């Protein structure tokens, strides 16, 4: 909003300084000072970024109009000059207004729970597995995790969205075929968590949740959700799957970007199996608690009898696999993830499970089933459709959220309306997704709010929520 106000003031000022009167007058200097005040306010509060380049340029031009032009009427006597100036203002105005609207700063919802959220990154090395994912890397398998936890109020410093944000922005641009400049403003995203905050000093123990990101994304891609869950009394560990995440940067500076993958059922099944191995390793390390001395105070918060997992896309598929294979995982959620990996048991997971899908995903799966989509994409969507059906066993929840697509479950839904569904309300979807996920884990790990999921269905009649 501050950027839009700055643009509006700047545009009104340009009418005066270019078309009515230019030159070094008290009025013009005052107009300039007002604009520079807005400029510095936006830079301090939000940060300088590429989306505002047209505005910066126009302010530079207005400054020249005041200090380098004689005091005279600014309207040219030649019609051509008038037209050119007018067109220039129109084009600049359109750019100034549209860029911040098309590429807004991601606004994460403030957590609604009672706990302050702390966060800390850890580096894990699996000495029992060699790196087989990353080409020309024969070291032990390495992973980064980001932990979110209830913390003491007033401790720690505000956390950045992603520690190596420039590298992340660069790689997201590469994988999505976009210019690097388009993603650079990700670094302006403000979080509601505190880096290295002191873990809460309390007798209470909290359930542990593991989070798996989507293919080519990153562990913090669902910060809107990770912070909310920690504020509600969960310790949440977000995994960054090396070689499959957009980028992974280790403490020694070594960087591993995402590798190309083969889009075949066999290859995708194998990838999920690798992610299972990573997740099992992380869970083992967390339970043993010996990988980092500073983790001990966080480990003391955890109730290891109450562990769940959730994830988006391939991270969701991994959550489903962990649920049926690891007795320590008591409940799981798959957010719009095709159920790749090993086939689900005929009787279903036999433990609390929720499969959430975007309305657009369901639409594409039905089109594939009806042969309206051809090629490998059709084959993959058909497999996902059939596997979704096999999971619909007694006790399983299936959810379809209207006006959503695959990205709607992530922070990147707020990156640009260009990638949203028509009439999609990103903020409202974040609220709904958080309600569903928190209520599901509250019910199945904390034993509270037994009917809260059904209550959510009543609040959102357009929501397709079914308990099989």
Locations of the language-model features?
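Short substrate-entry loop that stabilizes the transition state in hydrolases
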Residues: 190-249, 363-364
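Domain-level recognition of soluble alpha/beta enzyme cores
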Residues: 98-209
């Amino acid at each position: 909003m501050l950027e839009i106000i700055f643009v509006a003031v700047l545009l009104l000022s340009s009418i005066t300084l270019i078309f009515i009167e230019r030159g070094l007058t008290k009025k013009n200097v005052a107009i300039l000072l007002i604009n520079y005040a807005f400029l510095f306010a936006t830079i301090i509060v939000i940060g300088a970024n590429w989306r505002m380049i047209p505005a910066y340029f126009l302010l530079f031009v207005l400054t020249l109009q005041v200090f380098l032009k004689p005091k005279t009427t600014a309207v040219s006597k030649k019609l051509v000059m008038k037209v050119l100036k007018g067109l220039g203002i129109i084009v600049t105005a359109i750019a100034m207004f549209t860029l911040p609207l098309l590429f807004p700063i991601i606004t994460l919802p403030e957590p609604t729970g009672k706990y302050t959220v702390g966060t800390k990154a850890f580096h894990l090395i699996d000495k029992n597995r060699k790196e087989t994912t990353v080409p020309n890397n024969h070291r032990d398998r390495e992973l980064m995790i980001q932990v979110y936890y209830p913390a003491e109020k007033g401790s720690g410093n505000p956390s950045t969205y992603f520690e190596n944000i420039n590298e992340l922005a660069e790689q997201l641009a590469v994988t999505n075929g976009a210019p690097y400049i388009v993603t650079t403003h990700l670094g302006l995203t403000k979080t509601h968590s505190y880096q290295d905050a002191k873990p809460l000093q309390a007798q209470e123990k909290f359930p542990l949740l593991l989070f798996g990101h989507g293919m080519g994304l990153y562990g913090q891609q669902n910060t809107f959700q990770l912070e909310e869950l920690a504020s509600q009394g969960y310790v949440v560990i977000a995994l960054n799957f090396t070689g499959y995440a957009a980028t992974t940067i280790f403490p020694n500076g070594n960087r591993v970007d995402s590798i190309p993958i083969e889009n075949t059922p066999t290859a995708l099944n194998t990838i999920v199996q690798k992610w299972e191995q990573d997740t099992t390793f992380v869970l083992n390390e967390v339970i043993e608690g010996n990988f980092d001395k500073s983790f001990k105070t966080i480990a003391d918060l955890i109730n290891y009898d109450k562990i769940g997992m959730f994830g988006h896309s391939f991270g969701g598929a991994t959550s489903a696999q962990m649920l049926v294979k690891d007795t320590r995982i008591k409940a799981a959620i798959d957010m719009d993830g095709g159920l790749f990996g090993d086939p689900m048991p005929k009787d279903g997971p036999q433990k609390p499970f929720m499969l959430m899908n975007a309305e657009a995903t369901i639409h594409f799966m039905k089109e594939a089933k009806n042969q309206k989509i051809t090629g490998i994409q059709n084959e993959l969507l058909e497999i996902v459709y059939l596997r979704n059906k096999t999971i619909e066993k007694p006790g399983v929840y299936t959810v379809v959220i209207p006006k959503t697509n695959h990205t709607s479950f992530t922070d990147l839904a707020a990156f640009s309306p260009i990638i949203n569904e028509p009439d999609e309300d990103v903020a409202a979807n974040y609220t709904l997704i958080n309600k569903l996920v928190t209520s599901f884990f509250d019910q199945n790990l904390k034993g509270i709010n037994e009917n809260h999921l059904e209550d959510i269905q009543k609040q959102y009649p357009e929501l397709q929520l079914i308990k099989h």
